[in-house]
């Protein structure tokens, strides 16, 4: 089943990033992500209770018992929003390194090198392209996230906001990471999305296990490069290059 093929790529990606030839491309973004994680978690811990209170609906006294049922949903909602923010910021900062990591993983998997050799000059040259692509992802993400955020404040409707955020998050994990190998091959944004939709169930399987792994504090720092490697395996084995010739 396609949905079951997705999760295995993350596990294989984790094994791949342990190879000596790939460690440089893992350690640099890992260090940057650690700094982002520390800053964001410190801020989130200070504001967490306030955010939950802000999102919680105001219930009449006779329904006050429902707070014990509804409160965990809004705690989960805040955690999901914090997770999205960290993932978005960390991936923007690490984008050029993630692009190079994806290239090198593809070299290992295919057994041939069709990419320019690594150099700091080449890395600098990649920054405008990778940052442009990250901004395109942001433009895709923000309007949809804004709709979900508005729903989170609508009494009654906000009860379904958490599962909708989770489903959207799973899809975005597939978009975020599989885009690295797609962008390396100069596949256009709309073409990339169309290809992902054609592999929807496999994408949701990969995105789902990646989403869960990235929710675990500290473990998520290692799983981000593993997700890049796993997404590259996804691209190769699901024959992403076929999308280039359409």
UniProtKB/Swiss-Prot annotation:
GO terms for molecular function: high-affinity sulfate:proton symporter activity. Its main location: membrane. InterPro entries: CysZ_sulfate_transptr (IPR050480), Sulfate_CysZ (IPR022985). It is found in: Cell inner membrane. GO terms for cellular component: plasma membrane. The chain crosses the membrane at residues 24-44, 69-89, 148-168, 214-234. It is a multi-pass membrane protein. GO terms for biological process: cysteine biosynthetic process; sulfate assimilation. Keywords: Amino-acid biosynthesis, Cell inner membrane, Cell membrane, Cysteine biosynthesis, Membrane, Sulfate transport, Transmembrane, Transmembrane helix, Transport. Belongs to the CysZ family. PANTHER family: SULFATE TRANSPORTER CYSZ. High affinity, high specificity proton-dependent sulfate transporter, which mediates sulfate uptake. Provides the sulfur source for the cysteine synthesis pathway. This is Sulfate transporter CysZ. It comes from Pseudomonas aeruginosa (strain ATCC 15692 / DSM 22644 / CIP 104116 / JCM 14847 / LMG 12228 / 1C / PRS 101 / PAO1).
